[in-house]
Amino acid sequence: MPRSLKKGPFVDDHLLAKVDVQNEKGTKQVIKTWSRRSTIIPDFIGHTFAVHDGRKHVPVFVSDSMVGHKLGEFAPTRTFKGHIKDDRKAKRR
């Protein structure tokens, strides 16, 4: 179920504060964050976030098409190695 419109999008306060400081200074440094649950808002456009995937920080450059999504959607946590090909020679042995 989506979040109520009267509540507005959820963004961690510390993350919003870091973006506001960079917007005031006019800098675009990478912002390291563990907040995968934060919603991307229009203030984030043009910034690069290093989103934690459980092991390392994945750089995510925010564009206008990402607004409304969560930061965690762009940093996958699982690595898909592919399905094992059906090997008939190995089955005979």
UniProtKB/Swiss-Prot annotation:
An example Gene Ontology molecular-function term: rRNA binding
Keyword Oxidoreductase listed: no
Alphabetical list of InterPro entries matching this protein: Ribosomal_uS19, Ribosomal_uS19_bac-type, Ribosomal_uS19_CS, Ribosomal_uS19_SF
SUPFAM superfamilies membership: Ribosomal protein S19
Any single Pfam family the record assigns to this protein: Ribosomal_S19
Cellular component GO terms, alphabetical: cytoplasm; small ribosomal subunit
The keyword Metal-binding appears for this protein: no
PROSITE patterns xrefs: RIBOSOMAL_S19
Biological processes per GO annotation: ribosomal small subunit assembly; translation
Protein keywords: Ribonucleoprotein, Ribosomal protein, RNA-binding, rRNA-binding
NCBIfam families: rpsS_bact
Entry function: Protein S19 forms a complex with S13 that binds strongly to the 16S ribosomal RNA.
Family to which this protein belongs: Belongs to the universal ribosomal protein uS19 family.
PANTHER family the UniProt entry points to: RIBOSOMAL PROTEIN S19P FAMILY MEMBER, SMALL RIBOSOMAL SUBUNIT PROTEIN US19M
Protein name: Small ribosomal subunit protein uS19
Organism: Rhodococcus erythropolis (strain PR4 / NBRC 100887)
